[in-house]
From Swiss-Prot:
It comes from the Bacteria. Belongs to the universal ribosomal protein uS13 family. SUPFAM superfamilies: S13-like H2TH domain. Residues 106-121 have a biased composition (Basic residues). One of its GO terms (cellular component) is cytosol. This is Small ribosomal subunit protein uS13. Part of the 30S ribosomal subunit. Forms a loose heterodimer with protein S19. Forms two bridges to the 50S subunit in the 70S ribosome. InterPro entries: Rbsml_uS13_C (IPR027437), Ribosomal_uS13 (IPR001892), Ribosomal_uS13-like_H2TH (IPR010979), Ribosomal_uS13_bac-type (IPR019980), Ribosomal_uS13_CS (IPR018269). The lineage of its organism: Bacteria, Bacillati, Bacillota, Bacilli, Lactobacillales.
Length: 121
């Protein structure tokens, strides 16, 4: 298994797919990385030469991925909560942030439904 940005990427898959195992790299970014590194998308990870691996590593190192990206996202959410913006308040209360209705659904964000004692009559 090749190791890129601290992540073991699978050997038996195509490089374009294997790169998406790194947090912060999707299919579009993966294709851009391979084009910049001059590596074919169809080649398998196990068939990469050391020079090709190094070229891919250099391109990935130029992008914010894995721990750095997770840290930045968490700091952005913390900043929203500290300044008291609407989105920050929704994050703090554990409610949907992007305008979804909460009357009936939003169970993923709100958690399991809790019964209220004495409600039924």
């Amino acid at each position: 298994m090749a190791r890129i940005a601290g992540v073991d990427i699978p050997n038996d898959k195509r490089v374009v797919i294997s790169l998406t195992y790194v947090y912060g790299i999707g299919l579009a970014t993966s294709k851009k990385i391979l084009a910049a590194a001059g590596v074919s998308e169809d080649i398998r990870v196990k068939d990469l030469t050391n020079d090709q691996e190094d070229a891919i590593r250099r391109e990935v190192d130029a992008i914010k991925v894995e721990g750095d990206l997770r840290r930045e996202v968490n700091l952005n959410i913390k900043r929203l909560m500290e300044i008291g913006s609407y989105r920050g308040i929704r994050h703090r209360r554990g409610l949907p942030v992007r305008g979804q209705n909460t009357k009936n659904n939003a169970r993923t964000r709100k958690g399991k439904a809790v019964a209220i004692a004495g409600k039924k009559k």
